[in-house]
Design a protein with these regions (language model features):
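Short, contiguous alpha-helical
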Residues: 1-9, 15, 21-32, 43-83, ...
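Short, surface-exposed alpha-helical recognition segments that flank or form part
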Residues: 15, 19-23, 88, 92-95
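Acidic catalytic patch
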Residues: 108-122
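Helix-adjacent hinge/juxtasegments
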Residues: 68-108
């Protein structure tokens, strides 16, 4: 409509680094959202799968993975401590996941604007974000399946909320 009236429409240029950070932010927030919405009965329940981990252990793994690369890349920036899968509570895990999200956005965001290097990681900053979005989605799928197998399926509203990336990215 604006063009029909002879008014030029101006759009901000697309910045891939910003788009990657926004996508990661949403994905990481979904991790935290899922933990906050989990039925309490599934947190420490033994896995029904052979050689399976508890949901607490899966969430601990989600959080702990990648922390060392962040510490090496930006030693001066605060990176959350690793979680202990044996004693972590859902509230502690949710807080830690939020802290990790903020650390990744700060550290990897800076790397994306610089040389793209994540110290010790075999790929660049964009690869780091992509790798961990896929990694985390895989484990979210395991958590959802395991909750169902334990007789406590994730609520429909929570499942819908996991796909509301625009909303999650703003939280």
């Amino acid at each position: 409509m604006a063009q029909a009236l002879g008014v030029a429409r101006t759009r901000r240029p697309f910045v891939a680094a910003d788009a990657l950070l926004k996508a990661y932010s949403a994905s990481a927030r979904v991790n935290q959202y899922l933990v906050q919405e989990l039925p309490a009965a599934v947190w420490r329940a033994p896995s029904p799968l052979p050689k399976g981990r508890t949901i607490a252990a899966l969430v601990t793994h989600l959080h702990n993975c990648g922390l060392r690369y962040l510490e090496r890349t930006a030693p001066g920036i605060s990176v959350p401590a690793e979680l202990d899968r044996v004693c972590v509570t859902p509230a502690q895990a949710a807080r830690a996941l939020g802290a990790k999200r903020r650390a990744v956005l700060a550290i990897v965001g800076t790397a994306l604007k610089g040389d793209g290097r994540i110290v010790g990681f075999p790929y660049d900053a964009a690869g780091y974000l992509s790798y961990y979005m896929v990694h985390d989605a895989h484990h979210r799928g395991q958590i959802v399946l395991q909750a169902r197998l334990l007789g406590h399926p994730i609520r429909r509203q929570t499942m819908i909320g996991m796909w509301q990336w625009s909303k999650r990215a703003k939280e």
